[in-house]
Amino acid sequence: MVMEADLGRERRQRWGSRKIDLDLLLHGGSRYLDEQSNLEVPHPRMTFRRFVLEPAVEIAADMMHCVAGMSLSELLEHIETTEDRIRLFSDQERGSIETLQTICRDLGCEFSASSLSPVPSKFEAAKLNVYFPDESETAERQMAGKGPLLKLATDDSKHWGLEIAAAVSALNKC
């Protein structure tokens, strides 16, 4: 953010127009999270953004995404060959059903639990498949489903709506 400010960027509105936007997508094979600056590497939304993956594949097709456990070319192939659906997942304990219902309602999606367990672990909606993986599940198994993958912020579900809305918007532009 310091570099952006030095180049004249003023932060007025999230996802508003700006002079420059620098995103750190990957750094070797390491994972980094700084909650104070809101920096997360790998970038949490790069796995479903074609405009990020296509140029990345041109320069580093075999580079591994340390969270997804797939190469950049595999991630791009995954979004090119799957249904028009976004899979969401969170490390939180099952998340907030009420929050997800509200988000789906606000986006005009239907919300239905597709699990018989008392606290459903999977929810389906139009273009949304909200998924809370078990701790034992590997990244490979999480990626095995259909649709691009978006990892929801683990600290607070109040921002999920913005993240999901941005993902749906990106999907609709593809």
Name every feature range the model reports, one short phrase each:
Residues R85-L107:
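Glycine-rich phosphate-binding P-loop
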Residues M1-A5, R9-Q92, A113-C174:
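Flexible, gly/pro- and Lys/Arg-enriched active-site loops
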Residues E110:
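Residue-level detector of anion-binding/catalytic polar loops
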